[in-house]
Amino acid sequence: LFEYLTYKCQHQQRFVVRSMQSRCLEEHAQKLYDYAQALPSVETKALTIPQKGGRKARDVKLDVKYGQVTLKAPANKKEYAGIPVYYVGCLEQGTSKDKLAWHLLTSEPINNVEDAMRIIGYYERRWLIEDFHKVWKSEGTDVESLRLQSKDNLERLSVIYAFVATRLLALRFMKEVDELT
């Protein structure tokens, strides 16, 4: 992840990523997740976690927090400089041991609660994007199996298949909504 974020910053590319491990910070002795716990909550967000596999659906309340930090280069990557990022956290309230915790890192400036909520909204939409790619690449149109010789033909057909994938995804959502009503 560190190399990826370094590349994104060096090329002034925007990003929102979820940190899956607590990282060392340059400006604090504590790690990212401990730093996040100490931040004040600026908003409460309600979220319904859908049923999946053996997990039951549940409603949760999340504390929204944000700040600016510099990620310290890992010990085995001393040649890298620290990476300044904005942190947005969505941490489930309560005492459950399996609490939801989204630790998001972004290049987008976070100056207020509205900025933080916008980043959370981007992250919440990740499943829609992943579903689109799944339908486009393999499940629905199988664009990956195309064996065209011409780059132009491949581009044209990819665009057509992307349109078809969008329609297939819309039909799936309409079916799911219909089943709920």
Regions found by a protein language model. Give the residues of each.
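Single, function-defining residue in the core of a domain
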Residues: 1-181
